[in-house]
Amino acid sequence: MRPKRYFCDPSLAAALLGATPERLLGDMQTLGMLFENLVPRDVRVFLSTYGGVDNSVHYFRDEKDLEVDLIVEHDGRWGAIEVKLSETKAGDGARNLKALERKVLSNPAAQNAAPAFLAVVVGKGSIAYTRDDGVAVIPMAALGA
């Protein structure tokens, strides 16, 4: 796993950019970058409410550029999350997640556990569902209280 830096609050970056809602809706690249900073922040907040030690969130990229936005570890278990602004990109995220799962489980000597979950968090989506490959697709709004 390699370190990746995130804004503590992506609204700070939006303010520095002078990004109004109207401007962001016209600039999907910047909106996507801000969204990819928002989800890790919120996942860290959610995870902080769980008891126990060893709760952590990491970014993963290997030497072949397989990349997964978030690896969540809690209580000896792990899961992986890809972040996509649009639900239409959920398939891309699911492919990365399944590739990571295959990589982790392909070394029998390591005796790695299977992931507790694989999920794509999307900014624009109507409902949460599980794809045929077992990857959950979850709209960000569904994660709120």
Q: PLM ranges: what are they?
A:
Residues M1-A145:
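A cross-kingdom feature that marks ATP-driven nucleic-acid transaction machinery
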